[in-house]
Amino acid sequence: MNYARNDDNIRAVVLNGSRANLNAPKDIFQDYDIACLVNDMSPYFKNPNIPPLFGEIMILQEPEDMQEPPAENDGHYTYLMQFKDGNRIDLSFDLPELFKAVIEDSLTVILLDKDGILKDIPPSSDKDYMPKPPTEKLFQDCCNEFWWVSAYVAKGIWRNELTFVKHMQDVYAREQLMKMVVWYFGIKTDFKEAPGKMGKYLKKQLDPEIWTELEKTYSDAKFENVWESLFVMGDIFRRLAKDVASNFGFQYPQQEDDNVSNFIYKIKNLPADAKEI
């Protein structure tokens, strides 16, 4: 904080992220997400003298200085700093128009306010991170995409295309599965608890049986195990989707489920040299 207090160009500093969340579990690896409001960006743009001020750097990343994705150069610069002592600081500098978006985050704690411009910010809370109930359209789209991609996975296994299979299953199919898991979690918690980034807090509220089945969807590279994980994925998705549909009065697309499930089982039983389906 002395760095910010002694720099007249820095007008305010806030803390975001898990350290601003009273409900987040505390541990030794929590990052410090710090954002600084500045009047002039030029002193903080690609400045190699800034990171060493906070400790001995193990590895440094500057997102706005990376080739991909291309930087927008829009009045924002970030230093992601992992220190050798185990601490990490994500330090950003923002011009006023971009700092507005930073302080709109419900997880915001004021650390410094030289001009009294942040006095109306409410106490930090995780309300922005609560799951939201699905619309029927979102629900139907999720079901459709899950079963659509599941067929891709099955065809990829038959073709012996490991990298394609793992990507389709662990990125696209899992994305839809986790949407459904979060909606189910929301129902169980009345949509008043946050599932955490990537669902990291789901385990504490899911039935142990469901969590055990979810673990089984993470397979190794052996195709027999990938098949099994795909079937378990389908079982969990179907079970939770029917619960979600029942809770909100939606119609579960059973016909799509049946069509794709039967197709997947048929592919599994196809000989490797099959000339027709």
Question: How should these model regions be labeled?
Answer:
Residues M130-I277:
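Conserved nucleotidyltransferase catalytic core and NTase-mimicking acidic/glycine-rich helix/loop elements
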Residues P51, L107-V109, D115, G199, ...:
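Generic secondary-structure boundary/loop-capping signal
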Residues P25-I28, I103-D105, P195:
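Short aromatic-enriched loop/helix-cap "lid" or pocket-rim segments at secondary-structure transitions
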